[in-house]
Amino acid sequence: MNQVAGQRNLAVRRDNRLGTVLDSAAKCFCERGYDAASMRDIARDAGMKAGSLYYHFPSKSELLVAVHEEGIRRVTTLVTSALTRPGSPRKQLEAAMVAHLEALLGGGDYAQVVIRELPEMNEEQRCRLIGLRDDYEKIFKKLIDALPLETDRMRRHLRLLLFGALNWTRTWYQAGDEAPSDIAKGFLELIKET
């Protein structure tokens, strides 16, 4: 095997391991919380040596940022896919809410990690995660801006209310009680358009 092919194979193996590392980190952060999950736990779950984990990520906080990035990418993909069907502003918002709830309640570790409060980390990492969150929230801001509400203040309050209600479902939701679509419709029924 020539050197170029060997480097290509190493890069492919590295990429394959990266997905496993991220999945294991999301699982450990979800099950144990950020503070209690150790790099050793994550490496064990990924089937690798603890030292090998540092090849991919220099610190646990960098690994958390990568899990957040992947989690937000996944949820964003679901929400934007749900918005490809035409509909009224209210129907579009409902579709986005259903997709958000399906991601959150579908048992995926990434979504559970993303909605938790951010642990202590350096300012650059915190800014990256806040930027990712803000970019995701812009999808909902655009949908809410299309609703016939009287003021921007009402739009802001509605956005905050919806995110609080949607994200809190993970606390009280029991599988089989209601479908995410029923929950989203129920939340929207509480809000009267003016």
Question: Can you say where each PLM-predicted feature lies in the sequence?
Answer:
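N-terminal intrinsically disordered/low-complexity leader segments
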Residues: M1-N16, K27, P86
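Generic hydrophobic, amphipathic alpha-helix propensity
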Residues: R17-A25, I42, V67-V75, V79, ...
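Helix-turn-helix
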Residues: T20, S24, C28-E62, A66
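Short coil/turn segments at alpha/beta junctions that flank glycine-rich nucleotide-binding fingerprints
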Residues: E31-D35, P86, G107
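Hydrophobic alpha-helical connector segments
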Residues: A66, T80-G106, L158
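Amphipathic alpha-helical packing segments from all-alpha helical-bundle domains
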Residues: E70-T80, E123-L149, R155-L160, D182-K185, ...
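Amphipathic alpha-helical segments used for helix-helix packing
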Residues: Q92, L104-E124, T171
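Amphipathic C-terminal alpha-helical segment
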Residues: A103-G106, K142, R159-A179, E189-T194
